[in-house]
């Protein structure tokens, strides 16, 4: 059921992009829905994910919440990096 829902959402987004691209609108207005649709589709394919908050141990930047990086603040080659700004 979840895959069907995602498929319907993807089809809707693609149809919306096609309709907007065929209309005689401004180029800037055409580009924005495509950017939004790409980001939304990417988020749907990845599924729900929780980010790692600040000062919590991490392994790579992708798992940290936005505006945070997985790094050590004291030693460059530490064993336990944390999500930090």
Swiss-Prot record:
UniProt PTM: Contains 4 disulfide bonds.
Tissue spec. comment: Expressed by the venom duct.
Keyword terms of this UniProt record: Disulfide bond, Pyrrolidone carboxylic acid, Secreted, Signal, Toxin
GO cellular component: extracellular region
GO molecular function terms listed in the Swiss-Prot or TrEMBL record: ion channel inhibitor activity; toxin activity
One Pfam family it belongs to: Conotoxin
Localization in the cell: Secreted
The keyword Secreted belongs to this UniProt entry's keyword annotation: yes
Entry annotated with the keyword Nucleus: no
Propeptide, residue positions: 24-49
Domain notes from UniProt: The cysteine framework is XV (C-C-CC-C-C-C-C).
Entry's family note: Belongs to the conotoxin O2 superfamily.
Entry protein name: Conotoxin Lv15a
The organism of origin for this protein: Conus lividus
């Amino acid at each position: 059921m979840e895959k069907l829902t995602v498929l319907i959402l993807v089809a809707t987004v693609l149809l919306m992009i096609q309709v907007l691209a065929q209309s005689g609108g401004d180029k800037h207005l055409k580009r924005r829905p495509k950017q939004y649709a790409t980001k939304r589709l990417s988020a749907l394919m990845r599924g729900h994910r929780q980010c790692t908050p600040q000062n919590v141990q991490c392994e790579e930047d992708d798992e940290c919440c936005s505006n945070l990086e997985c790094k050590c603040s004291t030693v460059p080659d530490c064993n336990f990096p944390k999500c930090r700004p």
